[in-house]
Amino acid sequence: MEKPKIIALYGSPRRKGNTAALLKKAVEGARDTGAAVEEIVLRDLKLSPCLEIYGCLKAGDCAIKDDFQKVRDKILDAQGLMLASPVFFYTVSSHTKILMDRFQSLWVKKYWVDKTPLEKQNNTRKGLFISVGATKGKKLFDGLLLT
């Protein structure tokens, strides 16, 4: 039986912060159960923010050529996704937000172009989101839940 593939995305700008430490523990746990986990540090990638040039309207693919396509393909090929981001101003880090915004192209593909971005996927994917914040506000994580 093939090991399930999981992508672990480190969305913090700090390599050895609390967010990274928690995701590292989750990665260890997944590997202990037999999963093949690939770790990707978003701060190491060349990711442009969405430029709203509407190239995705043509075929559902983002027109900006950078590391997004490689990460997108790995995520689409995986059975699971782990994402970790610290709280920055009541939302995710800029590294994480850029990646999330770029996935708008899949929404366009699904709802505007051909409505089948995940047609080859017949399984249920699993996801885990880890976030850490330093302030004590009662609504500290509300923005992340909405995002």
Where are these regions (language model features)?
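N-terminal beta1-alpha1-beta2 submodule of the flavodoxin-like/Rossmannoid cofactor-binding fold
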Residues: 1-108
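Short, glycine-/small-residue-rich phosphate/pyrophosphate-handling segment
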Residues: 110-147
